Amino acid sequence: MQKQNIVILGSTGSIGKSTLSVIENNPEKYHAFALVGGKNVETMFEQCIKFRPHFAALDDVNAAKILREKLIAHHIPTEVLAGQRAICELAAHPDADQIMASIVGAAGLLPTLSAVKAGKRVLLANKESLVTCGQLFIDAVKNYSAKLLPVDSEHNAIFQSLPPEAQEKIGFCPLSELGVSKIILTGSGGPFRYTPLEQFTNITPEQAVAHPNWSMGKKISVDSATMMNKGLEYIEARWLFNASAEEMEVIIHPQSIIHSMVRYVDGSVIAQMGNPDMRTPIAETMAYPHRTFAGVEPLDFFKIKELTFIEPDFNRYPNLKLAIDAFAAGQYATTAMNTANEIAVQAFLDRQISFMDIAKINLKTIEKISPYTIQNIDDVLEIDAQAREIAKTLIRE
């Protein structure tokens, strides 16, 4: 078997590092062909030393210059590129077999679309592609004959629990024809699922990033605490699996052992289980339709004391309700909400606003943007820019 060339968009982040771990566990199968990051020179330098990619790219031009000099000094032949255009070109590189799309935020949008338009096999971990582009993105996957495989643990669990006919029609699954009655999206509920509501005003960034089950970046940890993460996943699931609101259900599962489920019309429920480790869904997408070693500890059923399930409380998780409502309102609303949330979470981490303010800023931002039908990527970027300014203004107020 010939080695697969993997381009990792976001190699210096949490998903990127886990992807490199899977590559390291399967050196005969995969090669880190190109690594892409933002401005983290040190991490990228270490990755280049270890994995010797053909290309390394940083979005920040000055950071790329420093990286290039460091690699030359250490006689590493990796070619260093800089800027958004170079990153988009790497995402569509003719020698790339698979693209891990894991750049967080709107910055990951254009490179992911570049990979799709090149007809690549795209391992999708960038939420914004579907949250902000939805129909545009799904249509592009079809029009350019790209292959889309979901990396998010929940969407990957749903993917594994669906019949092969659905797996081959991501974005266009005829769920009811295949006997699917419900897609059940599970979430841990974050670290504050039992915290009294009156204490929410005192929640600190340190408390919010301490996720009870998963090891994740700061932004996604806060999103998990507010359940915006689940809201974004709800939006993604609707697009990925062509699901109606009636075909979706969100439940809290504190142990994070069942990663999501599919309910069928005959009464069956198929669930995907495993230890909470992102290397499992990453390895599943990289090897699909086969399996490969991920380096993950096997699930020990005797150590699982219980599996519990709780109905979400929208008073506790207003961001979840907001995301569900935003999908119903349209693509402009999900785009504005996503951008506002990005700004609000960073402001919370920087101690400019309180934990409770995050959802308020998200809602107010949507309310200040006029309903609008998105027709192309420029429309998405325009709403993103508007929402960014509105959210920043609200934070200053």
Curated annotation (Swiss-Prot):
1-deoxy-D-xylulose 5-phosphate binds at residues 127, 153-154, 188, 211, 224, 229-230, 233. Pathway: Isoprenoid biosynthesis; isopentenyl diphosphate biosynthesis via DXP pathway; isopentenyl diphosphate from 1-deoxy-D-xylulose 5-phosphate: step 1/6. It holds the Pfam family DXP_redisom_C. GO terms for biological process: isopentenyl diphosphate biosynthetic process, methylerythritol 4-phosphate pathway involved in terpenoid biosynthetic process. Keywords: Isoprene biosynthesis, Manganese, Metal-binding, NADP, Oxidoreductase. Its EC number is 1.1.1.267. It comes from the Bacteria. It catalyses: 2-C-methyl-D-erythritol 4-phosphate + NADP(+) = 1-deoxy-D-xylulose 5-phosphate + NADPH + H(+). Its cofactor is Mg(2+); Mn(2+). PANTHER family: 1-DEOXY-D-XYLULOSE 5-PHOSPHATE REDUCTOISOMERASE, 1-DEOXY-D-XYLULOSE 5-PHOSPHATE REDUCTOISOMERASE, CHLOROPLASTIC. Catalyzes the NADPH-dependent rearrangement and reduction of 1-deoxy-D-xylulose-5-phosphate (DXP) to 2-C-methyl-D-erythritol 4-phosphate (MEP). Belongs to the DXR family. This is 1-deoxy-D-xylulose 5-phosphate reductoisomerase.
